[in-house]
């Protein structure tokens, strides 16, 4: 899998989270102790267990809606890759179609020949604070 396929896999997994399914997100993330997640509620999480708990909380909300990356910029060097982009879409958390438009940075590391996310940093989203 190349880095662009990994990005696609992450956004599929993110849309699955929005629909309440956490399983694909578990596949794209590294389960290492050094992973980090600066989540949309403002939390700064370190380690797979804490990162997983945040994603599970979001999946349990079963928000509905969809997001996709725009203006994707990829930097790839050896076994690390960094992506910067906007996440654009809609959220149905409050019963309507609230726009989503945030900035995102992802860091991927190649583990056993596959790209895995080791860091995800988003802008704050008041719907998840």
Listing of model-derived features with the role each one plays in the protein:
Residues 1-24, 30, 34-129:
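A beta-strand edge to alpha-helix "cap/lid" segment located at domain peripheries
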